[in-house]
Amino acid sequence: MSGKQLPMASKTPPALRPKPKRERLPSWFRTTLPSGEQQAIFNSTKAAVKDNTLHTVCQEARCPNIHDCWASGDATFMIAGKECTRGCRFCAVGTIKKAPPLDPEEPSHLATAVESMNLRHAVITVVNRDDLADSGADHYKKCISAVHERKPDVTLELLCSDLAGDHEALAHLLEGSPLSVFAHNVECVPRLDKTVRDHRASFSQSLEILRQAKVLRPDIITKSSLMVGVGERDEEITEALHLLRNAGVDLITIGQYLAPSDKHLAVDRFPEPEMYDVWAKEAIAMGFSGIASGPLVRSSFKAGLLLRKTRDTENSETMPGAYVYVARHENDTPTPLNGGVY
């Protein structure tokens, strides 16, 4: 198994273990802060989010790419609240048993923010709302429609929950939707569901949501994401990629899990950056339309750029720190758009 392997977990009961010392991150996780014009764009993005009383997954999930994305004018908006009704062990988003009512003004606020930021591509993600009969599907649809009505030229990507496996709610959400991308993350390999995710989530349930989305709307690109460093083996990543591709998933991202705090799931390993290139090439060989793979890659990281590259409308901009491949035509050899820069 390549990369930096962390010590095996102790069999001592958690309550009796000494508090572990957090491992120093490998050198390839170094990032730079924005300055000059990029700092000004970062500040403008931050102000647009604050002025419209919105939440972003960039902030709530403590994403390591926040400076890079916000300095480029990119942001992933989080709707339906800032706290989730589930408690996955990897996630920095807050958990709440009884969520507050949905904000009826949120669709309008979201549309205003997207308009003011002059985005080409907007990613909208959600918290789980198991307290709602439709898991929030109708609210998500209203938010998407509001943005499209205000800015029809902006491509839209929804990073959706599993909607508690409700295919009727999914059908309502996707009917007539202007979405370019429907994304839902399986997060980890199937064997690790109980270790990593909330007990109400599973790889199989997530896979069926992705499969059904493609059946309902074959014109919409489907997308998912895998984390590494949560206890998986290299071959399990390959197996999970096969399952996702067989479900009709078009785009995939692979990135390193980083524990938000000592209270979250501990990091198991740090694969070497070159391993992400291996997975990327495997994914394209399986028939995925595109992949971004690298330690700092997250499902929404430069999502618009990956979409444009997949559609062959963007060839100049690169994704430093990621191995990015797209299949230009069926049965083509993989086309590397840029190598990893660390």
PLM regions: where:
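Auxiliary Fe-S-binding modules of radical SAM enzymes
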Residues: 1-76, 80, 92, 108, ...
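Conserved alpha-helical substructure of the radical SAM core
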Residues: 95-122
